[in-house]
Amino acid sequence: MDGAYGHVHNGSPMAVDGEESGAGTGTGAGADGLYPTSTDTAAHAVSLPRSVGDFAAVVRAVSAEAADALRSGAGPPAEAWPRVYRMFCDMFGRYAASPMPVFHSADPLRRAVGLYLVDLGAAPVETHAELSGRMLFCAYWCCLGHAFACSRPQMYERACARFFETRLGIGETPPADAERYWAALLNMAGAEPELFPRHAAAAAYLRARGRKLPLQLPSAHRTAKTVAVTGQSINF
């Protein structure tokens, strides 16, 4: 990245560390608070993952161009969104297809944001408000790549809250007693894991006979080999 951060980088304003070049003042961002993604700080830009660096620079450049159009009274540039969309789809396709050797807590949310952007399609955007929002979501997707280290979270807090209401593919919220359930399960696994299939078979048997309440768990210091059920027994 260039050393002169106060100059234009790839057509996008880059502020000196600690400053947002005109953010919220009308000199860098568009009027009415639109296009906050038209500027960035050098420190934040270099902290992004290298895999999204080029795309983030394009988002800044397109946002700055659109902000200029807004200030001059023109509509959004016709090719602005199609250009960003094509680049994002290519990048997101590689991201979605790549193996994840280490799970990151932001990955499910990042996939949800990515799928939302892909579903928008490549048609040109007609209003500045819509284009500004899409640029913000693109920047948010990039920043999820350095979640917990991002220095600009306040930019996303309201606009991106919608993504926390979506289904992220990580299951339902666990019940309040989930910790007690898993603690018992882990204790069983540590004692005799080979009994798991038999416990599951017993549970299925009991469920089929209409039993709703769980059996009493054996004490931590005793392993039960037989569970009595209405005069019968299930041997483990």
Curated annotation (Swiss-Prot):
Keyword list, A-Z: Host nucleus, Late protein, Metal-binding, Virion, Virion tegument, Zinc, Zinc-finger
Domain of life: Viruses
Zinc fingers, unnamed class: 138-150
Location(s) in or outside the cell: Virion tegument; Host nucleus matrix
Chain intervals with Gly residues compositional bias: 21-31
MF term (GO), any: zinc ion binding
Nucleotide-binding as UniProt keyword: no
Post-translational modification: Phosphorylated.
Alphabetical list of Pfam families matching this protein: Gene66
Entry's Gene Ontology cellular component terms: host cell nuclear matrix; viral tegument
Region feature (Disordered): 1-32
Induction: Expressed late in the infection cycle.
Family the entry assigns: Belongs to the herpesviridae US10 family.
Name of the protein in its database record: Virion protein US10 homolog
Species this protein is from: Equine herpesvirus 1 (strain Kentucky A)
